């Protein structure tokens, strides 16, 4: 963030905020070593809310999953967007 944007009070775009949240969640899971996926329903609900601002979708149109294999974690988000 630049000093100018800080002084002018520009808000971050919702995409960058969502990206930061996802990075924090994944980093937290890697450090904690807890069983995953307790946050996935909340994440799915929040993604639907954000995407619904721009495109009409329902809860059934988005699927979120987290898979772990050895040291690799994959967060998969599938979104069905209707034809325009």
From Swiss-Prot:
Q: Which Pfam families does this entry report, sorted A to Z?
A: MinE
The domain of life for this entry's organism is Bacteria
A GO biological process held by the record:
cell division
Q: Which Gene3D superfamilies match?
A: Cell division topological specificity factor MinE
The UniProt keywords, alphabetically, are: Cell cycle, Cell division
Is Disulfide bond found in the keyword set? Answer: no
What family does the entry list? Belongs to the MinE family.
Q: What does this protein do?
A: Prevents the cell division inhibition by proteins MinC and MinD at internal division sites while permitting inhibition at polar sites. This ensures cell division at the proper site by restricting the formation of a division septum at the midpoint of the long axis of the cell.
Q: HAMAP family given for it? A: MinE
What is this protein's record name? Answer: Cell division topological specificity factor
- The species this protein was found in: Burkholderia ambifaria (strain MC40-6)
């Amino acid at each position: 963030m630049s000093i100018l944007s800080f002084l002018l009070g520009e808000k971050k775009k919702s995409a960058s905020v969502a990206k930061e949240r996802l990075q924090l969640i994944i980093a937290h899971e890697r450090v904690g070593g807890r069983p995953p996926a307790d946050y996935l329903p909340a994440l799915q609900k929040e993604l639907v809310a954000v995407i619904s601002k721009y495109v009409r979708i329902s809860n059934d149109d988005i699927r979120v999953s987290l898979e772990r294999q050895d040291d690799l974690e994959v967060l998969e988000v599938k979104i069905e967007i209707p034809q325009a």
